[in-house]
Amino acid sequence: MDHDLITKLTGQVIAQMRQRTIPLGISNRHVHLSAKDYQSLFPGQTLKIKKPLGQPGQFAAEQTVSLIGPRGQLKNVRILGPLRGQTQVEISYTDARQIGLTAPLRLSGDLTGSVSVTLKSEAGEINLTEGVIIARRHIHMSPLDAAIFGVTQGETVKVGIEGTDRKLIFDDVCIRVAEDMRLEMHIDTDEANAAGIDGGQAVARLLLTKR
């Protein structure tokens, strides 16, 4: 087959693949615990899987905690597994205002200088000196997905939300690339409500990269 024809056909296939939609995951408030903090809150207990999540190996656990801030508390906040090296609490702006916190907007794992909160279970209580964030909206991709979409780790893009009565465009969506990632965009409940997302019909579509 002619080389130029192969190049042309390959380009057409990639262009079509870039038009595919991206599944949406809505992140409610949740906690990732370190092994040490987990044992303080749930001594002698095994972290029990309630249901698997969209990313391979990740799951919602049966265990929950309360988050206690200066002006109130949020009860029954789900623990996500597996356990991590450092405890991280992810809430929305609405949640933060409700309990009197001024949490920074960060990517997962960027916890230096973030705010504190008290975590309480039936068996224990810990004061987390830092670790509370509002998660930046982002898209998980494998290296192959990133190559197909023409994006790189850490890049920000524009994404359109489709399949709702309130179509919306999100700017500054961060690309997160790793071998074990499955294609999925993550937004929080505030963002989902703004887009009128109710149920599983909504999807995301990559609109524009910002290099």
From Swiss-Prot:
Instruction: Give the family this protein belongs to, as stated in its UniProt record.
Output: Belongs to the PduL family.
The domain of life for this entry's organism is Bacteria
Domain remark from Swiss-Prot or TrEMBL:
Formed by 2 beta-barrels, each is capped on both ends by short alpha-helices.
Q: Which reaction does it catalyse?
A: propanoyl-CoA + phosphate = propanoyl phosphate + CoA
- Quote the subcellular location field of this record: Bacterial microcompartment
Q: What is this protein called?
A: Phosphate propanoyltransferase
**One matching Pfam family:** PTAC
Q: Where does Zn(2+) 2 bind?
A: H138, H140, H186
Q: How is the cofactor bound, as the UniProt entry phrases it?
A: There are 2 Zn(2+) ions per monomer; Zn(2+) and CoA bind inbetween the 2 domains in each monomer.
Organism listed in the record = Shewanella putrefaciens (strain CN-32 / ATCC BAA-453)
Q: Give the protein's cofactors.
A: Zn(2+)
The GO annotation for biological process reads: propanediol catabolic process
Q: Which of this chain's residues are annotated to bind CoA?
A: I26, S27, N28, R78, N193
Q: Where does Zn(2+) 1 bind?
A: H30, H32, E90
Keyword presence, Protein biosynthesis: no
Q: Name a GO molecular-function annotation.
A: metal ion binding
GO cellular-component term (any): bacterial microcompartment
Q: In which pathway does it act?
A: Polyol metabolism; 1,2-propanediol degradation
Q: Under which EC number(s) is this enzyme classified?
A: 2.3.1.222
